[in-house]
């Protein structure tokens, strides 16, 4: 059963400009592993987290640091902990599907939470 679906788009040049203006934004929104990646990968991970929040019904009370987008070979997946793991458990989420892409200056993420 599908519990939630989320989609988000992030313009990579806007992400880069925002990071230039607010350097602390990266530390707040991305884990250390994500923060050292190229801008296009950072933007994709930001979009992934936004899509996850949408799929879980909103981001209130959730920490950006409580999820990390992990690459396993060609596939990407979330590692959830803390507030995000609790929210997923409360909703009955058993599996989170994640798809990421970046092309033509845009990063796109789609998340499906399955129970």
Curated annotation (Swiss-Prot):
Q: Which cofactor does it need?
A: Mg(2+)
Catalyses which reaction(s)? apo-[ACP] + CoA = holo-[ACP] + adenosine 3',5'-bisphosphate + H(+)
EC number per UniProt: 2.7.8.7
Where along the chain is Mg(2+) bound? 8, 50
Top-level taxon in the UniProt lineage: Bacteria
| GO CC annotations on file | cytoplasm
What is the similarity comment for this entry? Answer: Belongs to the P-Pant transferase superfamily. AcpS family.
Q: What does this protein do?
A: Transfers the 4'-phosphopantetheine moiety from coenzyme A to a Ser of acyl-carrier-protein.
Q: What is this protein called?
A: Holo-[acyl-carrier-protein] synthase
Q: What's the source species for this entry?
A: Cutibacterium acnes (strain DSM 16379 / KPA171202) (Propionibacterium acnes)
* Lineage, opening ranks: Bacteria, Bacillati, Actinomycetota, Actinomycetes, Propionibacteriales
Q: Which gene name belongs to this protein?
A: acpS
